[in-house]
Amino acid sequence: MKRWFRSGRPWVWLTASSISISLLAMLAIIVLLAGQGMRYLWPQPVWLLTLQPEQGVQRALMGEIYAEQTLSPQQLEQADLTPASGDAETRYLIKIGQREIHGQSFRSLLSRDIVRFDKPADILVLKRTNNGTAYGYLAGMLEGEQPLVATDLPATLQHRVEQVQGLLAKAQAIRMGEMAKINQQFEVLRLEEKKRQQTRTLDNQALARLQAERIELQRRFDELSRQLTALNLDINRDTVQLRDANGSVHLIPLRDIEQAWYPNAMDLWSKVRHWGNQAKYMLARYSPDSNSAGHLFPAIFGTVLMVVLMSIVVMPLGVIAAVYLHEYAGKNSLTRWVRIAVVNLAGVPSIVYGVFGLGFFVYLIGGTLDQLFYSEALPNPTFGTPGLLWASLTLALLTLPVVIVATEEGLSRIPMSVRHGSLALGATKAETLWHVVLPMAVPAMMTGLILAVARAAGETAPLMLVGVVKSVPVLPVDDIFPYLHLERKFMHLGFQIYDLAFQSPDVEAARPLVYITALLLVLIVVGLNLAAIGIRHVLREKYRSLSL
């Protein structure tokens, strides 16, 4: 045994076990997130539950069986429920949807309350923009005030839903495209007039020009408004008649319906296609109320854009600081204290950086920029409010110590003989640094970037103070000059997870979306890291011969 310990094999087994446990834990997280998030995309069967009669009236309920729990007689007594017998009972959590009718999206039932379970093939599921999912039977459709006559009503419903969604997308393109440009031009004219008033340069000629431009813009805006009104007439025309489990018919405007399907009539291939359509719809769709509607594209876009901007800022600053500390700064007590401070900054809680970013970047720098360059827009702030730029700078400051430490470690691993050889061949110190040392240290810089991206992408607390919001009317990037709007607020996957889990009006219904959002955040971080690792590997192979 002593010989076995002295051989070092126990430590090999210990390290191998640690790596295996880490990989298994990571795999378990991925499986958990993917499995729980699958409920949001995969069509679940809808049950028709016949309930015990109440005062001689037969009752029924329609919905998805969301969860089951077996309760012992002791648990029933603790819940103030009288056990029907000495046996355990099953409690079902039923997703009933139609929150505007029931007042809630879920209902809890015991097995004693249910007489029969049925799964009719003609149960229709409507995914709506408001008040949750709707379940029922398709009783008919109204075109305006008149009943719609069709030989195949379910196919007509699918066609009309797709048609209305196309009209909604066209209307949204008008509002967020041409109308947004015109509104921006109106704002430019207003600010120009206000600035001329402040500088006393508003003469009759300038006033006439501004008025003529406003008249032309108003003419174009009115024309777009007429197009939008015509689209809204077509969008609001149709209504779906949905009959619930008890026979009552409810009217649902077709514009509120995003998708419609019959889950109990689907075979495996139909369910796979539905899963793909749901995933595409969730990842590619954008609307101003994307958070509540389950559209993740704005949050994905905001997360990636913020991380890219953060990387653009933090890499030059971190590399320059590391080069100075290692190549130029003298080895004295001051530089030792600076290195200690840099290392300790990595352990500062992220919310502290958020408070600093709010006070320094937003209020001080942003407020100063508004007074110097955007005084005509005051008191409405331009950069003196949380936004994408300040969030990126705050996270760049948060991850700066990581990049400095990783780059300095890479510089320290480069042999001094390489530097001496370059100097002996006649190169200056700056040329040696630029053409020899820095290329060999690029893999270490990429390591710092990987660590910075991994930390920044998952941060939420500081972003809540410096720019992230629940939903955005427009993205930070559009086709309006200057195309990248750094002053705008943005959405982030980390904040969306928090908002869906704790601030959603229907937490239980949003739970699968929380898991799938978390899975997307993990995949984005892994994807960005893999890209950086690939670049690091290529550069390491390129400069491997220099280190020999």
Question: What positions do the PLM features span?
Answer:
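Interhelical loop and adjacent transmembrane-helix boundary motif
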Residues: 467-519
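Membrane-topology segments of multi-pass transport proteins
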Residues: 1-16, 20-28, 35-291, 547-548
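Membrane-embedded alpha-helices of multi-pass transport/permease systems
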Residues: 316-321, 352-355, 390, 397-418, ...
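Transmembrane alpha-helices
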Residues: 404-408, 414-415, 429-467
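Alpha-helical membrane-interface segments at transmembrane helix boundaries
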Residues: 288, 293-305, 309, 335-346, ...
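Membrane-interfacial helix termini and adjacent extracytoplasmic/periplasmic loops
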Residues: 275-294, 353-396, 467-469, 477-483
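Transmembrane-helix boundary motif in ABC transporter permease subunits
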Residues: 310-342, 355, 363, 532-541
